[in-house]
A protein has these predicted regions:
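Basic, helix-initiating cap at the start of DNA-binding domains
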Residues: 1-27, 34-43, 56-57
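Amphipathic, non-transmembrane alpha-helical scaffold segments
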Residues: 9, 17, 63, 67, ...
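Key DNA-contact positions within bacterial/archaeal DNA-binding proteins
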Residues: 46
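Alpha-helical DNA-contacting segments of helix-turn-helix folds
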Residues: 52, 59-66
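Amphipathic alpha-helical segments used for helix-helix packing
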Residues: 88-115
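Hydrophobic/aromatic-rich alpha-helical bundle segments in the mid-to-C-terminal region
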Residues: 111-115, 119, 133-180, 184
Length: 184
């Protein structure tokens, strides 16, 4: 049997994840049957589950990919870049984002599983804010955990607004965010 290149394997994995995102977005986790995944991805269940052992692993892979993407944006473009990126996300991305949030609410073990799969993501975010604080960019009269919660609340609210078709004034929102977190 010929050896398959790493590029081919990565392209096939990306194809599966993209099709899975569309399926989860359209039908939710429960409604994303294996048959629907096969139809949307254009591959057999054997091909799909050769890359991911089950539907749950496929869903978690999407969540981990999104978490990595968020961290890359946060590290390279900062909080402004992250919030701007949220306003540009596809409807399918937003639908999966909220499906994950719904599942986090009903399945507390999911957060532990996500942290176990990607322990460096939370640490990298904390380190970034610590660095910003040391550089005098983030206020020091409020604990970092509160700042993280604040930014997450803004990001989640912005994602919800965009997903229902609202177009918030992002520059005004960013000004409010910075009023709340920037060093005085």
């Amino acid at each position: 049997m010929p050896k398959v290149s790493e590029e081919h394997l990565q392209a096939r994995r990306a194809q599966i994840l993209e099709g899975a995102r569309r399926t989860f977005a359209a039908h939710g986790y429960e409604g994303a049957t294996v048959r629907r995944l096969e139809d949307e991805i254009g591959l057999s269940r054997g091909a799909i589950f050769n890359y991911f052992p089950d539907k749950w692993s496929l869903f978690l892979a999407l969540a981990a990919e999104d978490q990595h993407g968020f961290m890359r944006v946060l590290e390279t473009e900062g909080i402004d870049g992250l919030l701007r990126r949220l306003t540009q996300e596809s409807p399918d991305w937003l639908a999966v984002y909220f499906e994950l949030a719904r599942r986090l609410r009903t399945n507390p073990e999911l957060m532990e599983e996500l942290q176990r799969r990607n322990p460096e993501a939370s640490r990298r975010g904390d380190e970034l804010l610590e660095t910003m604080r040391r550089e005098g960019k983030v206020r020091d009269d409020v604990d970092l955990e509160s700042i993280i919660v604040f930014v997450n609340l803004i990001a989640n609210g912005l994602a919800l607004a965009v997903s229902i078709g609202l177009q918030p004034d992002l520059d005004a929102l960013l000004q409010l965010v910075h009023t709340g977190i920037d060093a005085q």
